[in-house]
A protein has these predicted regions:
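Conserved Walker A/P-loop ATP-binding site and its immediately adjacent core
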Residues: 122-146, 155-161
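Post-DEXD/H (motif II) to motif III coupling segment of the RecA-like Helicase ATP-binding lobe
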Residues: 208-212
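N-terminal accessory nucleic-acid engagement/regulatory domains that precede
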Residues: 1-61, 145
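Walker A/P-loop
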Residues: 89-113
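Conserved pre-motif I regulatory segment
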Residues: 54-97
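Pre-Walker A (Motif I) flank of P-loop NTPase domains
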Residues: 89-95, 123-124, 186-188
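Post-Walker A helix-loop "phosphate-sensing" segment adjacent to the P-loop in P-loop NTPases
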Residues: 114-123, 147-149
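Inter-Walker segment of RecA-like/P-loop motor cores
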Residues: 148-206
Length: 212
């Protein structure tokens, strides 16, 4: 179905689609490098390069309540997560549970960059959330953490639909290429809600089935 849509689009609109939003080697290196070398978040570089140091900090030294110890606890949690990935990178399922404020969003971004380093077969990243507010928050966190362009990151939920109206001919004018990318999720990193995720897996609408 998808290939037929692409072929029809190219024939009717003279619009061949050649970029499917795949994470190639250049983008992979840019994501990893920008996360580690982000001047606004120097703790990411420490996390990746000094993982063992944070893991070896005894919990007894972090019992006193202070911002410093809170940040060290976050780094310790993140370091243990990264270390587990490095030891079991051939696994397909990981589970992270931590209280609010523990830095799970930053850990997830660090985890994704490490996965990209270990597994060259990974070509896309999907974040699935229960609430649209979490999509919005994580979208901004990703933009603040890595060097990613607007056409490489997308939000898919009911409050972030394709921002254009169809013309009388049923096309999107100069935005038609953007519409195709949105329809087929031609983006390296996609953030979506549970509703959209399960709609893709179990829905029977034409547009939902394009992604299967």
């Amino acid at each position: 179905t998808a290939s037929d849509y692409y072929a029809t689009s190219e024939y009717m609109n003279n619009l061949p689609i050649k970029d499917f939003g795949i994470i190639d080697e250049n983008l992979r290196k840019r994501i990893v490098s920008s996360f580690v070398n982000n001047e606004n978040k120097p703790y990411n570089k420490n996390l990746i390069e000094k993982t063992e140091n944070f893991i070896n900090i005894p919990f007894e030294e972090l019992e006193e309540k202070s911002n410093k110890n809170l940040n060290l606890l976050r780094q310790k949690l993140a370091s243990e997560t990264i270390q587990n990935l490095r030891n079991h990178y051939d696994q397909n399922l990981f589970y992270l549970e931590a209280p609010t404020g523990a830095g799970k969003t930053n850990i997830s971004i660090a985890f994704a960059t490490e996965l990209l380093k270990f597994d060259k077969s990974l070509s896309k990243i999907f974040y699935v959330f229960p609430f649209t507010t979490l999509v919005d928050q994580t979208f901004q966190s990703i933009k603040d953490s890595i060097d990613i362009n607007d056409d490489e990151l997308i939000q898919l939920h009911s409050k972030a639909g394709f921002p254009s109206n169809k013309t009388q001919e049923g096309e999107y004018g100069s935005n038609y290429k953007n519409y195709i990318d949105y329809l087929f999720v031609n983006y390296p990193i996609t953030l979506l809600t549970h509703i959209r995720f399960f709609d893709i897996l179990k829905g029977n609408s034409k547009e939902a089935n394009y992604l299967l």
